[in-house]
Amino acid sequence: NQLTAIRNFIQQEVDYIVLAPVTETGWDTVLQEAKDAGIPVIIVDRMVDVSDDSLYTAWVGSNFKLEGQKAMAWLDAYLEAKGRGDEEINLVDIQGTIGASAQIGRTQGFDDAVEAHDNWTTLAQQSGEFTQAKGQEVMESILKQSGDDIDVVYCENDNEAFGAIDAIEAAGYEVGGEEGQILVMSFDTTNAGLTDTLSGKITLDTECNPLHGPRVEEIIKK
């Protein structure tokens, strides 16, 4: 539990707290406690939604909505290049943990793109909680309902993509970008995600900036 961990750090009188929040909300009280104790808090990766921005010292993270927009712009261009720009395209969005800033931004990028295309339809949109096991479970359920109709699976991180791919292949479908296969998109570009991209199982993996650590170090040194 992140709230418990932060309070433990406050009791230990640490010099800095670096927080990568699971969700955006629910941080006001504990961050106020850290501020009252004189401990700077640096937010990393996902953002927090608080009533007073002075409760944290800095945020080092990514623009998740922009990531989603760029991924969907790539999909648009890819389908055009394949001569499928005017086809009816059915999409599945395996969302991240609901309320996390990465989920909010990447879902918004997805939703905006689908809304802008009359020939794109969202067949299902359900949280995979950013985990492989839940991603597989969600994908298995969706495949039972709509397996033959799915063109694109948009996974909001690599762990979900790994689970989705396992479910797709176990159900007898192929993953990949060619006609007749299910195209899998993902985010983060972990080492395993890059491996699946190079092998063609993931057609697009949008990188999430991995350089947060050095930037946090720079902030602390200042």
Predicted regions: what is each one?
Residues 1-222:
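A residue-level marker of the well-folded mature domains of exported/periplasmic proteins
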